[in-house]
């Protein structure tokens, strides 16, 4: 008995599909398919509400059409088989299904075999095997086999197997097999297996296989196997396989296998396989396999495999495999070969030498190396094989100790020499 009932239901459903298909075909015939005329339709409706077959310009309910042409407003379920023509004024709301649903404004659920497009705005749940796009804004959940794009703003959850892009701003969760990009701002979670970037600012969690970049500021958690960069300021947690850089300031936790750099100031915890550098100040905890440098001031804990240097001053704890130097050095300094400056304060240690080149320079505190050479003034204690100072206010301990301004008999002394002249 149940089998007989099921067969009857299938038969009725098949008959209904046949009737709907026939009516849809007739609607296409009514419109002369390739040149549809506005207003030509077969309607079962009251006050433009009900069921329509054809190119009805204004309708509410269930509507079937071969191809939309000069449509004004449709609300409900709109099923079209062929891409629209001259339909930029149309406002379609509800469920739109077809090869390529098109209108001036599309809102609701839009399902297209190829995709869906709007001359102005596209909003809602939009699905297309190829692409989704709007001349102005795209808002909602947008999933396309190839790409999702908006001439102005793209907001929501967007996925494109190849690309996701917006002419102005991109906001939300944006995922792409190749690239995610915006001509203006990009805000949210943005993932492009090759790249993610914006012409202006980028804020949020951003991943690009080769690179993540912003023309202005880049803020948030940013990661790339290639590089992470910003034309102006870069702030947050940044991981770049090759490098991390900012045209102005770089702030946060930054790690890369190659280099980290900023045009102005670099602040935070910075880890680089090769080098760390800034045109202005470097402040924080910095580790580099080769070198660390700052155009002006270097402050904090700085550890480099080869060298640490600054155009003006180094302050804090500095450890270098070969050398460390700046015009002013303050704090605790250790160098494998040599350390130098014109004004050195604190504790300074080197296996090879410690040097003050300027006759008006000064070193104060504790210094220890094989050769301590102070052409200016030394205040404090020095330990070395050879200690040389132009002026001394303190004590030298070494094999040979030389103080230039001591009396002749006491200029050169073995083991110990001292002077406490003001």
Which residue stretches match the model-derived regions?
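Intrinsically disordered, low-complexity regulatory regions of eukaryotic regulatory proteins
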Residues: 7, 32-33
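Bacterial N-terminal signal peptides
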Residues: 15-27
